[in-house]
Amino acid sequence: MKTALFTLLSVLLSGSALATPYKVDMGHSAVLFKVKHFNVGYTFGSFKSFKGSFEEGASVELTVDASSVDSNVEKRDSHLKGPDFFNVKQFPEITFKGSKWEGDTVTGALSFHGVTKEVSLKVEKVGAGADPWGNQRVGYYGELTIKRSDFGVSYGVKEGSASDELTLIISLEGVQKKG
């Protein structure tokens, strides 16, 4: 299946001259989602393949391969990749291009399923420090709830099989290689 890219964050701020670039450590990061199922429980999923980088307090770029979606049910994963949900053949990329990171809020344009909307992501700095190899690391966590129907994805909403609200859960650990 054609690779679909999910660029979740690309944030530019003033004062970035002192920003330090970090590469997202995929082995210690996660991009997850949850959606209510029949309004009685949640269905969770994740994306197994992504890459990115960020300059703390300045910019972030995250690209997620949407075809790597994994909900622990192969048949459902095939449906998620199809036209009712991600439609990876027609809309190969989902992007977020931020324009502002103030305090604990990152704001920018989320483009998904051919629609672009401004959204705000509340982030928490989890921690920062050196690893045993002398590299600097920093971690951020955030959740963003969107309405799927705002992006033209409304399969199951009317019937109640899948809620309109979808929450993205993003946990990124960045590493700055020494030297």
Where are these regions (language model features)?
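Low-complexity, acidic/polar, glycine-enriched regions of mature
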Residues: L18-G179
